[in-house]
């Protein structure tokens, strides 16, 4: 199993996370300036919290194109997406 840092890129955008299929097999949600990300793999769900380092107001880009930095990634896998998202909510 990959470690948490290898699973989630340190820098990304919501659009790139979607392209990595986290959005189609999990969820990518903006919560203020935080991005809650849940992805699925064959053994379970994983989770990460990102923070926006650019805003649409600063860049003129859509929020999905703004740069993100990884804040924290769960080291464990979860039984379902709800538990993974609950982990994200507890870590913002």
Regions found by a protein language model. Name each.
Residues 2-35:
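Negatively charged, low-complexity tracts enriched in Asp/Glu with abundant Ser/Thr
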Residues 25-52:
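Amphipathic, interaction-prone secondary-structure segments
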Residues 90-92:
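Short arginine-rich
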Residues 61-81:
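A short, exposed loop/beta-hairpin motif centered on an aromatic-Gly-Thr core
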Residues 48-62, 78:
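Short beta-strand segments and strand-loop junctions that repeat across beta-rich extracellular domains
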């Amino acid at each position: 199993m990959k470690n948490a840092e290898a699973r989630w890129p340190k820098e990304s955008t919501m659009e790139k996370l979607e392209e990595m299929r986290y959005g189609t097999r999990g969820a990518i949600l903006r919560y203020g300036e935080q991005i809650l990300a849940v992805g699925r793999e064959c053994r379970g769900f994983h989770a990460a919290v990102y923070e926006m380092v650019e805003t649409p107001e600063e860049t003129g880009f859509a929020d999905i194109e703004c740069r993100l930095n990884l804040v924290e990634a769960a080291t464990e896998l979860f039984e379902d997406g709800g538990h993974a998202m609950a982990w994200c909510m507890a870590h913002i």
